């Protein structure tokens, strides 16, 4: 196999695609590089579909190797383990834009693996992995209606920046990833600092325009190195069976979709499916699959047709109405902050917990170790949809929804100096019928304010949908689960009254114009403002006081040279401090001391003791001390915690002293004056002329 390499200028950097040198037994393998960041992406597909397969089994795995950054993994086994959150999120980021581009009816297993093999400090490998997945599929011969391009867009000083460096992102008001084909945007993932809808939309269009040269480069690579496309044809439909099922099932399904309550509707749909399976199914698994597929098409036609004809939606609403909302704050007695947010048949119980710096999450990434003071975890138990299932580690969807909600809230959090707490928010989805991630955003904002966190502004979120047939289309506000599955777009927008803080978009079809996206954003703004109005009626700002069960944090600054005095030999001093006061104490290398305690008096006591431990001894100042040890030549007196001075025998009294024991005893309280502190820090004391 001949090695073929293509290059393109992409945001001022050279993007290189190479195939034919590595992983040659994969159907498609492309090495993507920019700077010193290199990602190997492979695509492999099974030629035969598994019997009875009724869904498309696409698997995407993004993995970062420690050696890529010149590191050895930690832990006992010293090798990479379960996927990190970054790896899981990037796997989803790749999956979302490529999945809609496989032909309908294609049920063969496909696996895409992106492996980061080298990484620098300027180029994030996620965009390279996305581009590489597109290129690997394009050269593989697997049926795929690509390629796609992808780009990251920042907004700095009023200008859009293509593929910013890590350093540039720290000053950017926007971090947006957009992916799509030559004609259409397919996926957007972003977080923003309360930017307007117009700025967000222009960022999407800017990114789409800028990655066109990447698509052209992938097409050129595929023309030279691509394998012949598989001779795959879509399963042939049984027209006679289709007519029979349609005649029988259509009126029954129309009756089912006239039911506005989810559980009743689901039960009726299940009954229809069972009846059709009995009447038209057989022992032939293929025929049963065909019947299920036909029913799905009929359902899709009913729901979409009603909406485009202007009829009420599944639950009786028009296209712009938000479902009924009920809001409760402070619903749990012992938590630091809590809220119960219910929107229609979607409900989230959200709890906020305040912690100390020691509770921050330590993230060991390829780019280096960092700490995260804000964590948001989203849980989606099976009972939320009336089902049974496994309960355990979070799935990819839960991690993705949690990150979206976190992005939405992060823009309004106070700085560490304004509110020196670590924050953990947990969303328990108790009921779900669409838009549970946006219910989490609303609940998280309320729970944090209930906990006393001074947010810059409340945040709300709403999920939008789209039904489009030819020139006719309808944008839907606050979509249901069925509208998500049967629609053409899932468009989630979160933000404040001032602007957008997070936007996530997944589009399943071509032809979504700028005008349609603009309408969706404006309709989402109206929905968001409506929800914020209801939220503000319950809680519009952080409560003035923290929960009685939340830690009180005191922050003081000490001389870094005195840190050792607070810690003591082997941690003896700080251990005694925490045990005796009950406070948690954290000391940074720069001398910042954080004292946390649920009991305010305990925190104040710990503060006083640390101030004494780190206080500088002042010459000519009188101290209340305690005799620590008596010697023949005098006594050592403790004047501050950990600070002893020498009281020489000649300084005990104005009269001559022959035996120190005649005047002092160990443990005796005495008042002494500091005469001198020499260069070595040794302290000389005197009791002369000091009233005892």
Swiss-Prot record:
Residues reported in the UniProt entry to bind Mg(2+): 484, 490
PROSITE patterns listed in its UniProt record: KH_TYPE_1, S1
EC number(s) given by UniProt: 2.7.7.8
Domain of life of the organism encoding this protein: Bacteria
A molecular function GO annotation: 3'-5'-RNA exonuclease activity
Compartments (UniProt record): Cytoplasm
Domain spans labelled KH: 551-610
InterPro entries the UniProt entry points to: ExoRNase_PH_dom1 (IPR001247), ExoRNase_PH_dom2 (IPR015847), ExoRNase_PH_dom2_sf (IPR036345), KH_dom (IPR004087), KH_dom_type_1 (IPR004088), KH_dom_type_1_sf (IPR036612), NA-bd_OB-fold (IPR012340), PNPase (IPR012162)
UniProt KW keywords: Cytoplasm, Magnesium, Metal-binding, Nucleotidyltransferase, RNA-binding, Transferase
GO CC annotations, alphabetized: cytosol
Function (record text): Involved in mRNA degradation. Catalyzes the phosphorolysis of single-stranded polyribonucleotides processively in the 3'- to 5'-direction.
Complex formation: Component of the RNA degradosome, which is a multiprotein complex involved in RNA processing and mRNA degradation.
Protein name: Polyribonucleotide nucleotidyltransferase
Top-level taxonomy: Bacteria, Pseudomonadati, Pseudomonadota, Acidithiobacillia, Acidithiobacillales
Gene name in the database record: pnp
């Amino acid at each position: 196999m001949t090695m073929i390499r293509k290059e393109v200028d992409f945001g001022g950097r050279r993007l290189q695609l190479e195939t034919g040198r590595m992983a040659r037994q994969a159907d498609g393998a492309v090495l993507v590089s920019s700077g010193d960041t290199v990602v190997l992406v492979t695509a492999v597909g099974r030629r035969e579909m598994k019997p009875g397969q009724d869904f498309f089994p696409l698997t995407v795995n993004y993995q970062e190797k420690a050696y890529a950054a010149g590191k050895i993994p930690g832990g006992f086994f010293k090798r990479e383990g379960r996927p990190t959150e970054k790896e899981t999120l990037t796997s989803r980021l790749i999956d979302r834009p490529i999945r809609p581009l496989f032909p309908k009816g294609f049920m063969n297993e496909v696996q895409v693996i992106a492996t980061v093999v080298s990484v620098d400090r300027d180029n994030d490998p996620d965009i390279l992995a996305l581009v590489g997945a597109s290129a690997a599929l394009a050269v593989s011969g697997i049926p795929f209606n690509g390629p796609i391009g992808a780009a990251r867009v920042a907004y700095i000083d009023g200008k859009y920046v293509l593929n910013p460096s890590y350093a540039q992102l720290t000053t950017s008001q926007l971090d947006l990833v957009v992916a799509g084909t030559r004609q259409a945007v397919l996926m957007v993932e972003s977080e923003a600092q309360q930017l307007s809808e117009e700025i967000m939309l222009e960022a999407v269009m800017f990114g789409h325009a800028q990655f066109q040269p990447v698509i052209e480069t992938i097409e050129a690579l595929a023309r030279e190195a691509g394998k012949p496309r598989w001779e795959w044809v879509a399963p042939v439909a049984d027209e006679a069976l289709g007519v029979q099922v349609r005649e029988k099932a259509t009126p029954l399904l129309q009756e089912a979709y006239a039911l506005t309550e989810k559980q009743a509707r689901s039960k009726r749909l299940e009954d229809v499916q069972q009846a059709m399976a009995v009447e038209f199914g057989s022992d032939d698994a293929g025929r049963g699959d065909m019947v299920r597929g036909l029913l799905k098409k009929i359902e899709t036609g009913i729901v979409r047709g009603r909406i485009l004809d202007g009829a009420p939606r599944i639950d009786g609403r028009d296209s712009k109405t938000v479902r009924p909302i009920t809001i409760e704050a402070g619903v749990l007695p012992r938590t630091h902050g809590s809220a119960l947010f219910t929107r229609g048949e979607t409900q989230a119980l959200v709890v906020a917990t305040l912690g100390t710096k020691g509770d921050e999450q330590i993230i060991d990434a390829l780019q280096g170790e960092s700490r995260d003071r804000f964590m948001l975890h989203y849980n989606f138990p099976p009972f939320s949809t009336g089902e049974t299932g496994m309960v355990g580690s979070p799935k990819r969807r839960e991690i993705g929804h949690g990150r979206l909600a976190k992005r939405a809230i992060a823009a309004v959090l106070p700085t560490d100096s304004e509110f020196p707490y670590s924050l953990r928010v947990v969303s328990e989805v108790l009921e779900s019928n669409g838009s549970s991630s946006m219910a989490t955003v609303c609940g998280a904002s309320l729970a944090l304010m209930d906990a006393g966190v001074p947010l810059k502004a409340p945040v709300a979120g709403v999920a939008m949908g789209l039904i489009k047939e030819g020139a006719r289309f309808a944008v839907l506000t606050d979509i249901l689960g069925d509208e998500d599955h049967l629609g053409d777009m899932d468009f989630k927008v979160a933000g404040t009254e001032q602007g957008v803080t997070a936007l996530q978009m997944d589009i399943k079809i071509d032809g979504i114009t700028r005008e349609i996206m603009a309408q969706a954003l404006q309709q989402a703004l109206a929905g968001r403002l409506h929800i914020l109005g209801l939220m503000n009626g319950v809680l519009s700002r952080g409560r003035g006081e923290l929960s009685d069960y939340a830690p009180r944090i005191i922050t003081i600054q000490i001389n870094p040279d005195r840190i050792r005095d607070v810690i003591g030999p082997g941690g003896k001093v700080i251990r005694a401090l925490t045990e005796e006061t009950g406070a948690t104490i954290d000391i940074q290398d720069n001398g910042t001391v954080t004292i946390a305690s649920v009991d305010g008096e305990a925190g104040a006591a710990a503060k006083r003791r640390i101030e004494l431990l780190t206080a500088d001894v002042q010459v000519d100042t009188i101290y209340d001390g305690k005799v620590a040890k008596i010697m023949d030549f005098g006594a050592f007196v403790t004047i501050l915690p950990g600070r002893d001075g020498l009281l020489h025998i000649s300084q005990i009294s104005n009269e001559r002293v022959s035996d120190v024991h005649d005047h002092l005893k160990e443990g005796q309280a005495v008042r002494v004056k500091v005469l001198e502190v020499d260069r070595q820090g040794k302290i000389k004391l005197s009791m002369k002329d000091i009233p005892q």
